[in-house]
Amino acid sequence: KNSFYRLAERVLGIKENDIIEFFGAVEHPILYCDCKEHHFHVPAYSRVIIRDVDTLEPLENGKPGLVNLITPMVKATPILSVMTDDLGVLHNGDECPCGLKTPFLEIVGRVAPEDIKTCAAGAEEIIRGLNV
């Protein structure tokens, strides 16, 4: 992330404090916005469970696993819980100096094999093919 922030400042002139990052999933209507420390705090109307990659059992905070997003705010489909192919770590809110006390999510990678294409990857491939 830090190299991205340096690149954005060098190429675009955008300071790190002016960069706002979001995390979300197409099937989950909640956006996780970063705080001034660039942590994705979990809003009050959502929950995040980190699950063991092999057993899908919930893990305690601080351990990496699959990101499971939960919210009752879904209106279009009867889906309350979405398991992603993202790897993440859930941290206690008091570990962040920004002042927000809700837990925050750190994305550390993906588990999807390279031959599986997500919606975003498919869209990127189409856009590249258009030479835009």
Give the residues covered by each predicted segment:
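Active-site glycine/GP-rich loop and adjacent strand/helix microenvironment
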Residues: K1-V132
